[in-house]
Amino acid sequence: MASLAYDSYVDDVFKGNIDDADTYYVMLVTSSYTENRATHTKRSDVTNEVTGTGYTSGGQAVVPTFTKDTTNHRLEIVFPTVTWTTSTITARKAVYYKRRGGASSADELCFVNDFGSDVVSSGGTFTLNASTIRIGSPA
C-alpha cells in the first residue's frame, strides 16, 4: 500500500494553514484516478469518486491525531479506521482532505492512500484501515 502527501498539504501544514483543529474527510476513488502530487491541490482536482449503495459523495468525516515525533524530527498524522456499512462499492484509493463545507474547489487535499488493488464490498462493510502520514525527515 503506497501513500503520498500532496505537495500543497506539506506547504499548508508548515505555513499553519492546516492544523489539528480543522475538519477532515476521506473519500474513495477508483483506479481511474491518477494523483499528481505537484498539481492537485483541491478536492475539485480529484476525479473518479466511487458511487454505490452505502457511500455518500464526498466520503466521511475523520478525526486525525497529530503527534510531534522529537526522536525522528517529524510530524506524524494518523487518520483512523473508517467503515461504510451495507455498502456495494469498488475502490482503489482513499483521498484525505480538509473540508471547508462549501465548494470542492475550496477543500485542500492532504494525502492519497493507494491500496495496490481494488477493494470490493458487496452489500457488506467496506473497511478503510487507519493510515499514517509522516512529514519531515531525520536530522
Predicted features and spans:
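Small cysteine-rich, disulfide-bonded extracellular modules of the LU/uPAR three-finger superfamily
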Residues: M1-R92, R99-A139
